[in-house]
């Protein structure tokens, strides 16, 4: 039976075949706030079951679901659950916990105790204990979003460009250093708190399209490009279990 995993984020769309309980080879496309590139839609696979997670705008999500319903016998939409595959979400109302964060924790379950940092449009941080208990987290603007926000308020500040240095001597480098440094500082502070709170070493997993530039500043981190899709694979496997 052909099953596929689909992750519709705020700015990128990823999909992969389900291989066992992991995601297979990943394909990714950028998308706008309300529209998907025609080439991306034409390239979509078809099969028996599509497992779909989305944090994109409702209109875009509905268009994508309608497109998949034409290609798949069954389309399953992921919702955050209070408990799943050995993890328990800390939120009193799990429906308010983003499905991307939920799936990232499922993908990271085998690495617990772990801090999971997702770097996309937002920077999300969540801590998962060895017993599968979610200890909460935080949300901030990612470095890319910080840059775009600064440019929107002060157009003379470029929205991109520059390299990270500890003390920059030009504006482009200063912006990159400040925004990347702010993200790294929040991740490091959260990791230190997690280790004190759990009383044990805590692994650091990072994922998302904005993560690679931060890796040189986080020498202890492991990058998992397909973490959300791996979590979606775990969800799909759990959903299929009797």
Curated annotation (Swiss-Prot):
Pathway assigned to this chain's UniProt record: Cofactor biosynthesis; coenzyme A biosynthesis; CoA from (R)-pantothenate: step 1/5
Residues given in the record as substrate binding sites: 91, 98-101, 171
Cofactor: binding details: A monovalent cation. Ammonium or potassium.
Record-listed ATP binding positions: 7-14, 121
Top EC group: transferase
Domain of life: Bacteria
Predominant localisation class: cytoplasm
Biological processes, Gene Ontology terms: coenzyme A biosynthetic process
Family per record: Belongs to the type III pantothenate kinase family.
Complex formation: Homodimer.
Protein's recorded name: Type III pantothenate kinase
Gene: coaX
């Amino acid at each position: 039976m052909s099953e596929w995993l689909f992750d519709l984020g705020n700015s990128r769309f990823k999909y992969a075949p389900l291989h066992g309980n992991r995601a297979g080879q990943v394909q990714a496309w950028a998308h706008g706030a309300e529209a998907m590139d025609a080439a991306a839609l034409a390239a979509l696979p078809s099969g028996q079951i599509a497992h779909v997670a989305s944090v994109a705008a409702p209109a875009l999500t509905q268009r994508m679901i309608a497109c998949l319903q034409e290609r798949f016998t069954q389309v399953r939409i992921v919702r955050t659950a209070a408990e799943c595959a050995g993890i328990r979400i800390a939120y009193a109302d799990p429906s308010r916990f983003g499905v991307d964060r939920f799936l990232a924790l499922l993908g990271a379950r085998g690495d617990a105790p772990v801090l999971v940092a997702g770097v996309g449009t937002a920077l999300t941080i969540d801590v998962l204990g060895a017993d599968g208990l979610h200890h909460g987290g935080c949300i901030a603007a990612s470095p890319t979003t910080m840059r775009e926000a600064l440019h929107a308020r002060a157009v003379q500040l470029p929205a991109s460009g520059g390299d990270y240095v500890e003390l920059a001597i030009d504006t482009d480098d200063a912006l990159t250093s400040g925004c990347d440094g702010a993200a790294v500082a929040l991740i490091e502070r959260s990791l230190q708190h997690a280790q004190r709170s759990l009383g044990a070493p805590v692994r650091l997993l990072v994922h998302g399209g904005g993560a690679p530039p931060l890796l040189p500043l986080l020498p202890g981190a492991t990058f998992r490009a397909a973490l959300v899709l791996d979590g979606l694979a775990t969800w799909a496997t759990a959903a299929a279990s009797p």
